Amino acid sequence: MADAEDIEPLVCDNGTGMVKAGFAGDDAPRAVFPSIVGRPRHTGVMVGMGQKDAYVGDEAQSKRGILTLKYPIEHGIVSNWDDMEKIWHHTFYNELRVSPDEHPVLLTEAPLNPKANREKMTQIMFETFNVPAMYVAIQAVLSLYASGRTTGIVLDSGDGVSHTVPIYEGYALPHAILRLDLAGRDLTDCLMKILTERGYSFTTSAEREIVRDMKEKLAYVALDYEQELETAKSSSAVEKSYELPDGQVITIGAERFRCPEVLFQPSLVGMEAAGIHETTYNSIMKCDVDIRKDLYGNIVLSGGTTMFPGIADRMSKEITALAPSSMKIKVVAPPERKYSVWIGGSILASLSTFQQMWITKGEYDESGPSIVHRKCF
């Protein structure tokens, strides 16, 4: 690591739904692809076709009709390490086209990630990919960096999991972190269910991707759910049409806001959990009374599931209703919040003050995987 100046660190944000990867110092990830590994459902009969036993990311996505798709990350936490290794391999060699043994690698993890998981990540990086140095950072903390703050509460909601993470002067407060197993994938499932009730059939993993696209293009959060339902009944103002890959056209109306409403009312899908607004409030209430004012004034949204139009206004309205009446409440929804975890990682890994924080290969060889708990907190 003597000539560290000219070697850019790699930043890889492994999400449940998408992998975001690129070089530290860039303002956006170079590679963004789905966290999927697909294996053929049928055996190949065409000789010389060069069929692979596994496809990763976009290639798996484009051949989804003949593959069984698996997501190695569930609810933000890696559950299948062999597939995860395939994804990392694809990231380094095919997407970024770099040799990982020449670059330090910054990985991200979900808050409250099990200790064994961080160790396994560390072990794979050093032993399989031979990286010279690595670091594991908490996703929500990186989002806060990206918004230019060191204090605030981050609501990070991706495809697999949502978290509220209060951060004071750069330190996450672990006792007040709350996790909600309700995120983008559940909303996609919910929309699939609503559409199935209407007589459309969406069941396979490939069809789920169509519904996800429909959700991303058409769904929004209502400021007042009940009132919006009334409007939808009486007029066709909320109706929009969507063309399926086979040319069929679906018209969706109230479904557009019924689906993201689940974030605020998990009971709609039979979940006994508090909505994202209440979880955020509960998280703030678990913090010291002296810092709550700073948290209420810096509620930062991050992750793809916070991209719905109307979510920031609704969040602001709901939290204002829960908080003390004199409290000043500010919900920040940065336009780049889909990638703010990655951007925060890019900022962190390129800071000169961060360079002594890396776990080096030497330190790993000396202490083993448990070093990650001492150096990354």
Curated annotation (Swiss-Prot):
Gene designation: AC101
Listed Gene3D superfamilies: 3.30.420.40, Actin, Chain A, domain 4
Top class in the EC scheme: hydrolase
Major site of localization recorded for this protein: cytoplasm
Keywords, in A-Z order: ATP-binding, Cytoplasm, Cytoskeleton, Hydrolase, Nucleotide-binding
Miscellaneous note of the record: There are at least 13 actin genes in potato.
SMART domains the UniProt entry points to: ACTIN (SM00268)
GO cellular component: actin cytoskeleton; cytoplasm
Subcellular location: Cytoplasm, Cytoskeleton
Pfam families membership: Actin (PF00022)
Protein name as annotated: Actin-101
Its biological purpose: Actins are highly conserved proteins that are involved in various types of cell motility and are ubiquitously expressed in all eukaryotic cells. Essential component of cell cytoskeleton; plays an important role in cytoplasmic streaming, cell shape determination, cell division, organelle movement and extension growth.
Organism: Solanum tuberosum (Potato)
Chemical reaction(s) catalysed: ATP + H2O = ADP + phosphate + H(+)
